[in-house]
Amino acid sequence: MLTVFQALSMEELYNPKIEPQNFLKHVPVLKSVEVEGRLYTLTFIRQFENASVIHLHVDWNETVDMETIHTRMNRPKFKLRALEGYNCQSDGAGGGTGRVTHRFTVSPALPDDVSGFSFIFEEYDDNWMGEKTGLEIEIKIS
């Protein structure tokens, strides 16, 4: 029974991966929110014919030491809360000292004008089986 519930909690793993096709353009957004000393910025959206790729950049003050290296290896992960009518998938992250950029693929493609959209990013302590940490970052586009 436990296996059934674990499989249900990993539904995202069983959805087909969205592969953006035929790049169209970049849509600049540049909206930021600061929470607990970290600056979260929705920098831009890459538009494709069949999907959009959202970039969430996180920036904070960090120095390099052994504790920082250990912390970096255990960074929390973010998921984009599903937008009504859209399929949202995490597409990885990358970064370095004091910064990381998360990518999310949304299908079908978002409109070029995302005014009125509210993007909510939920923090998890692990990619797949992690628990929500309670931190939610909301970036509203006016």
Where are these regions (language model features)?
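Surface-exposed edge beta-strand/loop patches
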Residues: 1-55, 59-142
